[in-house]
């Protein structure tokens, strides 16, 4: 995510300070979004603000940031920064409404939700407000001015405004100690003698300032440890001729192989309590689904019945049914995701009342949300919508769309759920187990309502 920002926060007098955003990501198909909402989450009291719809613009072109900002790079050989198409442009208020004295809420998180209403899909981008204005030390830049350079207090060298020792005379004679010379008036008096060993530091090494690398300050990151925040990765600051600064921040998903970064201070990961609560909910409901599955299996003495109308493929025996059950459940539980059919099914159940809109679309009769689990590729196709029918002759389930008869393909397992929380877990050959969830199995219902509830403007 590229957030470019003028550093004129002190000049703001009226209203919120707007941050202009250019977003490109591989995590979500931005070309299909038709609505954008933002909300604030306050970490100190866990208050969640209402969703606010904001305008945006989509361009299906690659964007050169240097041309977009109309300025030249600092160096001739500096590589250009290209945002891959499609790119979404929008602006969001940096200062959240309702904050006293219109000050920045440093303990607040911004959630941007990109919605595809046609596909009932959405993508959340989360970042801390304070991360936008956090001071990033520029690695390799001069952090200490020449006039402010400090020598070791006990090193006898040329005097400056902050050092003591002997003075080099104008004729180029050798340095002489003030103890052996009568030029006391030409030197700044220092201590009578240096200490010996204080707190494990030998006097010969002084206080270590002479060993400092020129141009770097203690306590700042080195070139190998650039500051990073969760989901946001800083590339570099961009300076314009008018001294306006643009902060360039990358969403972690912009990289094909996202970097795994550590938070800059303890507890940052725990600040994202909303996301953690969602994943905790998913782990709970995932465990319930596995338990329900085996409860039915035990009641049937371990027998799997064919519930889908299909032929058993010839290569289905490459993976036995018991192995397929274990592998499919292992793949699904290890890749649990908010896009899962289980989340969509639970949300559709909680918001069945049309007066209570949500970001997940409703289901018609005999429609299911499904997760297609590819065991061989260790991959899941989340939250697809499919409509099942009942064959009149065999009373088995079938799908009129032949391209979506997944049970006829070897190595695939499918998890179904509808708005009544009826679940079906099927395997190659149409063998399946049916079970049902309850509200008691779901757990934190209020969390799901808070996360997936939507403003009424979504359906206007």
Curated annotation (Swiss-Prot):
Keywords: Capsid protein, Host nucleus, Late protein, Viral genome packaging, Viral release from host cell, Virion
InterPro entries, alphabetized: UL17-like
Any one Pfam family match given in the protein's UniProt record, by short name: Herpes_UL17
Cell membrane is among the record's keywords: no
Cell location: Virion; Host nucleus
Region (Disordered): 167-197
GO cellular component: host cell nucleus; viral capsid
Composition skew (Basic and acidic residues), residue ranges: 173-184
GO biological process, one term: chromosome organization
Role noted for this protein: Capsid vertex-specific component that plays a role during viral DNA encapsidation, assuring correct genome cleavage and presumably stabilizing capsids that contain full-length viral genomes.
Subunit structure of this chain's protein: Interacts (via C-terminus) with capsid vertex component 2/CVC2.
Family: Belongs to the herpesviridae CVC1 protein family.
The name this protein goes by in its record: Capsid vertex component 1
Gene expressing this chain: CVC1
């Amino acid at each position: 995510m590229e957030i470019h920002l003028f550093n004129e926060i002190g000049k703001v007098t009226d209203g919120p300070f707007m941050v202009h955003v250019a977003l490109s990501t591989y995590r979500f198909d931005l070309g299909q979004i038709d609505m954008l909402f933002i909300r604030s989450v306050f970490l100190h009291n866990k208050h969640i603000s209402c969703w606010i719809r904001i305008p945006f613009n989509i361009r299906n072109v690659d964007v050169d940031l240097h041309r977009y900002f109309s300025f030249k790079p600092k160096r001739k050989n500096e590589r250009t920064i290209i945002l891959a198409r499609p790119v979404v442009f929008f602006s969001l208020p940096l200062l959240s409404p309702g904050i006293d004295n219109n000050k920045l809420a440093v303990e607040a998180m911004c959630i941007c939700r990109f919605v595809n209403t046609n596909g009932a899909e959405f993508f959340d981008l989360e970042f801390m407000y304070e991360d936008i204005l956090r001071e990033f030390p520029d690695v390799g830049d001069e952090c200490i001015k020449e006039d402010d350079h400090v020598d070791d207090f006990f090193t006898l060298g040329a005097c400056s405004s902050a050092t003591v020792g002997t003075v080099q005379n104008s004729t180029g004679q050798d340095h002489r100690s003030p103890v052996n010379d009568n030029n006391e008036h030409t030197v700044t008096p220092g201590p009578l003698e240096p200490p010996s060993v204080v707190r494990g530091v030998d006097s010969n090494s002084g206080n270590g300032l002479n060993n400092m690398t020129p141009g770097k300050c203690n306590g700042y990151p080195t070139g190998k440890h650039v500051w990073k925040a969760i989901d946001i990765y800083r590339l570099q600051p961009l300076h314009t001729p008018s001294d306006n600064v643009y902060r360039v921040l990358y969403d972690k998903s912009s990289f094909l192989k996202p970097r795994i970064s550590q938070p800059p201070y303890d507890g940052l990961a725990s600040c994202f309590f909303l996301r953690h609560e969602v994943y905790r909910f998913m782990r709970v409901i995932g465990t319930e689904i596995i338990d329900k599955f085996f409860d039915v299996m035990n009641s049937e003495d371990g027998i799997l019945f064919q519930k889908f109308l299909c032929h058993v493929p010839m290569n289905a025996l490459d993976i036995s049914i018991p192995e397929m059950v274990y592998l499919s459940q292992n793949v699904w539980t290890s890749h649990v995701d908010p896009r899962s059919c289980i989340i969509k099914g639970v949300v559709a159940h909680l918001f069945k009342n049309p007066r209570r809109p949500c970001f997940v679309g409703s289901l018609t009769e005999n429609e299911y949300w499904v997760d297609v689990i590819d065991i061989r590729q260790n991959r899941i196709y989340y939250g697809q919508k499919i409509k099942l029918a009942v064959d009149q002759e065999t009373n088995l389930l079938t799908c009129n769309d032949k391209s979506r008869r997944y049970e006829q393909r070897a190595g695939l397992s499918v998890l179904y759920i509808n708005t009544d929380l009826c679940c079906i877990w099927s395997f190659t050959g149409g063998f399946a187990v049916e079970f049902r969830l309850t509200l008691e199995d779901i757990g934190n219902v209020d969390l799901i309502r808070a996360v997936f509830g939507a403003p009424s403007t979504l359906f206007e």
